[in-house]
Amino acid sequence: MSLLSKTRELNTLLQKHKGIAVDFKDVARKISEVTVTNVFIVSRRGKILGHSLNELLKSNRINQMLEDRHIPSEYTDKLIDVKQTVSNIGIDDDLSVFPPENRDTFIDSKTTIFPVLGGGERLGTLVLGRVSDDFTDNDLVLGEYAATVLGMEILREKHSEVEQEARDKAAINMAINSLSYSEREAIEHIFEELGGKEGLLIASKVADRVGITRSVIVNALRKLESAGVIESRSLGMKGTFIKVKKEQFLDELEKSN
């Protein structure tokens, strides 16, 4: 397959995700397919966003990394220190993605590292590993193209997250401001009772302890639920299960006091 054909393969996959969040697992699989490599797509802080590995590469250490969805902090630091593409790294180098405990198996292995940039900042790293063959100039062109596209997608997701957080914050504050003084007091005591973002509430118990009516608690919960801030589910005599849906809610509630 020519370099142009491989580039088009990557483009075709990304076009399918236009307007929606990219599945980095799919992208890793496609990069692996067109470059014939083992692939890690890693965030700036070491989170594994996507990967595609053959069985040979897997070891106890690699399996643990995949389970944790995170690479070791020492390796993350080494990756971040790489400012431009470094190719054909051998097994004895600390930057090799291959497990050193299996050195004899991967004696001819090669690792290539592509920094992922976007908006003038480091967003992550694309790590490719081959068991034997060297990376060619065409491989490097394709890898750098993939890293550029990944940077654009990660940056777009970051912007989407910021926008969503702003919308959530606005919805939370509107919900809090809609509460009466007694309802806000009830909500504060409810989450003090729960001791976290979810748990089982016995409304009558809180009402008796705080000295408010049960209807105040019910009204307060209803307002928050209708605003999409929490969800609740009646468990009959056991009480009501409550869970915060918007992560910033408890912080904003505390700030509003």
From Swiss-Prot:
A biological process term (GO) from this entry: negative regulation of DNA-templated transcription
GO molecular function: DNA binding; DNA-binding transcription factor activity; GTP binding
DNA-binding region: 203-222
Protein role: DNA-binding global transcriptional regulator which is involved in the adaptive response to starvation and acts by directly or indirectly controlling the expression of numerous genes in response to nutrient availability. During rapid exponential growth, CodY is highly active and represses genes whose products allow adaptation to nutrient depletion.
Compartments it resides in: Cytoplasm
GAF domain: region residues: 1-155
GO CC annotation: cytoplasm
Recorded family membership: Belongs to the CodY family.
Organism, as annotated: Staphylococcus carnosus (strain TM300)
The protein's name: Global transcriptional regulator CodY
NCBIfam families from the UniProt entry: codY_Gpos, PRK04158.1
Keywords, ordered alphabetically: Cytoplasm, DNA-binding, Repressor, Transcription, Transcription regulation
Major localisation: cytoplasm
Pfam families in alphabetical order: CodY, HTH_CodY
